[in-house]
Curated annotation (Swiss-Prot):
Biased composition (Polar residues): 112-126
Underlying gene: SUN41
Pfam families listed in its UniProt record: SUN
Cleavable signal peptide: 1-23
Loss of function: phenotype: Leads to increased cell size, cytokinesis defects, altered sensitivity to the cell wall-modifying substance Congo red, defects in adhesion, and reduced biofilm formation.
Record family assignment: Belongs to the SUN family.
GO cellular component, one term: extracellular region
Lineage: Eukaryota, Fungi, Dikarya, Ascomycota, Saccharomycotina
Protein name as catalogued: Secreted beta-glucosidase SUN41
Amino acid sequence: MRFSQATVLAFAALSLAAPAFEADNKNIKREDCDKTSFHGHHKHKRAVAYDYAYVTVTVDGNGNPITTVSPVLSIETIAKSEETSSTSTSISSTTTIVQNDSLTSDEPKTLSLPSGTIKPSSFATESQSQSQSSSTGGSGSGSTNGIEGDLAAFEDPTEEFEDGVLSCSDFPSGQGVIPLDHLGFGGWSGIENSDGSTGGNCKEGSYCSYACQSGMSKTQWPEDQPSNGVSIGGLLCKNGKLYKSSTRSNYLCEWGVKKANVVNKLSETVAICRTDYPGTENMVIPTVVGGGSTSVITVVDQSTYYTWRGGATSAQYYVNNAGVSWEDGCVWGTPGSGVGNWAPLNFGAGYANGIAYLSLIPNPNNRDSLNFKVKIVGESGSTVSGSCSYANGKFNGNSDDGCTVGVTSGEADFVLYN
């Protein structure tokens, strides 16, 4: 039995978004995100967005599926029997994994935050509250090497976050947490307020989401999520102080699975923007890869990461054209801007049952081609099943439907090249 690739794409249209003000003369518009808005999620829900489900199944040597997959929506299945130049592999058991995009198919009118479910370990005394704990890294003005973060690749954080110490007006930089000051939220990646609005400052009753350096994910989201499908993530502002919203970790950031990197063979920098999920679903979390450089990229362990309505979720990324800065590219874009949710290409990355699934995904918002090519290749000594490449708006030569590989051992690279 040979492991091959079958990709299922399910598209469900979402609602439109209105632009705010223009940031510069490059047809890039930046949203007025520091103001609150009564909207189901981020007030600038991505225009004409889709829900993706990528399913990889085991097939026999003739490309016939061994398992039966029951998709939820109208689907198109593309089954291919391919091998990459790296070592081929045989898999003795059936492998089925769904990689869901972070979007929901409905946009609720109001944001329903969970109540009565946050159980911080204890409230700090007044004297404790007045002291800055070194474990939090202080406010957004602390030294964190900017969006690069303060940890070396796969260096674990060492200082735990303490409930009830930092004020809600402070941002917990450091230990993997990076500030996104350009968004206007005081360093936070997004704010979900108790009155159903999003944006503004981290204030009483709000869930304040944060970004982690590339290769890491935030650990904090309440177990009790709204029944309307909206996702909630981040720290809780309670009695003027910040508290963890989950007991799953005492650290705010955790590393993904060491399975993928981005190798930039171009001369220009490329900004790759992860959706803030669970949370406001902004595509604002940057992985920035300079020309001639390499960066780790987050591959989430789907057995331990956030689940949406019982289903596993993967990391999803928007890939901007080379030369677009991360400040301009990792935002909610507008039609014709070609940035943010209008960037031409998506990456997907998840890990389950010993296999990392890495995907190149078309963005139906923008069918224009990137100004560079992408291929997923196994590193030396790695085992990768399937092949996946993108050039001139097409996948694996002439397909419009994206592609996925399975990394069963070692690591693979998203290679960016001319």
